[in-house]
A protein has these predicted regions:
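Intrinsic-disorder/low-complexity detector
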Residues: 2-102
Length: 102
């Protein structure tokens, strides 16, 4: 067998593997660097970041990158965006780690 071919196929399979998270009956594509769901600054990303840093549940997101674009608060978010934030928060609560402030 051609080891280069095997290596290439293995790499392709790893890249093709999708990661999903289901929360409150909704399944989210959380494939890093491939899914709009986990884009930096989006509701899912902000929820997971708030959980990671030990912050309170406070739905928000950024139109673009975090800190470099307009911040949208809960009152301006759609119900779907609030659910996406909540899913990100819960995702990190279940599978993520927490910032070591130590």
């Amino acid at each position: 067998m051609n080891l280069t071919l095997i290596s290439s196929v293995t790499k392709d399979l790893k890249m093709a593997k999708k990661e999903y998270f289901t929360h409150q009956g909704i399944t989210y594509d959380v494939t890093f660097n491939e899914s709009e769901t986990v884009r930096h600054g989006g509701p899912f990303d902000r929820g997971s970041a708030d959980s990671y840093y030990g912050r309170m549940w406070n739905p928000h997101y950024y139109v673009g990158n975090t800190g470099f674009s307009d911040r949208i608060e809960k009152e301006e978010m759609t119900p779907e965006q609030v659910r996406e934030y909540d899913a990100g928060y819960e995702y990190n609560e279940q599978f993520g780690d927490k910032k070591d402030w130590g």
